Amino acid sequence: MTGIPSIVPYALPTSRDLPANLAQWHIDPERAVLLVHDMQRYFLRPLPDALRDQVVGNAARIRQWAADNGVPVAYTAQPGSMNEEQRGLLKDFWGPGMKASPTDREVVDALAPQPGDWLLTKWRYSAFFNSDLLQRLHASGRDQLILCGVYAHVGVLISSVDAYSNDIQPFLVADAIADFSKEHHWMAMEYAASRCAMVITTDEVVL
C-alpha cells in the first residue's frame, strides 16, 4: 500500500537518547543555514497531535533563534498536483501525493516563511535535487545546514547525506524532526550520527 502510513504516538528523543556522534562540529551562526523540511499541512496531518505540536514547537524555537542570529532560513515544499512526469517513481511508493490546494501545500502557521527566506520546490527526497540550495549556500558563504522537519528517515536523512556529499556540515535536530515510528526515527539518528551528520537537540541549537 502506498502513501504515508498510520503513525502511532511515540516520545521524541531527549539528550540522553542521542547516539554518539563521530563528527565533532559546532554550529556557527556565521556559517549556518536552517532548513525547514517539508513542514506542510499534508505531511504533518498524519502525526498524532502531541507529537506534531512538539516538533512544530521545537522547530519554531529554532526558527526564532535563526532570525535573532542572522541565520538564513530555507524551506522545502512540494508543489502538489504533480503530473505523471513530475511525480516519476514517487508514485510507486507514495501514490499521487498532495494536491496543490492550500490545505495541503501551506507550511503550518507557526513556521510560515518570512520575507527573504529561501523557498525551494521539493521534487524528490533530497532538498538539493533540482533546486538551487547548494548554489545559495555557496553564494552566501555558508557551509553548515541545520535540519528540522519531516520525515526523518526519508527526506531529512537523504538531504543530510546530500549535504555531507557536498562538504556541507549537516546538523540533524533530533527533537525537531518526526517519523513514521520510534524505530524509523532512531534509525535515522543512528545512521546520521555514524555516517554523515551531527545529531543534536533543540536546546543545543538555541541555548
UniProtKB/Swiss-Prot annotation:
Pfam families: Isochorismatase. Keywords: Antibiotic biosynthesis, Hydrolase, Virulence. InterPro entries: Isochorismatase (IPR016291), Isochorismatase-like_dom (IPR000868), Isochorismatase-like_hydrls (IPR050272), Isochorismatase-like_sf (IPR036380). Pathway: Antibiotic biosynthesis; phenazine biosynthesis. It comes from the Bacteria. Gene3D superfamilies: Isochorismatase-like. The keyword Phosphoprotein does not apply. Substrate binds at residues 78, 87, 122, 151-155. GO terms for molecular function: isochorismatase activity. Changing residue 38 to A: Loss of hydrolase activity. Belongs to the isochorismatase family. This is Phenazine biosynthesis protein PhzD.
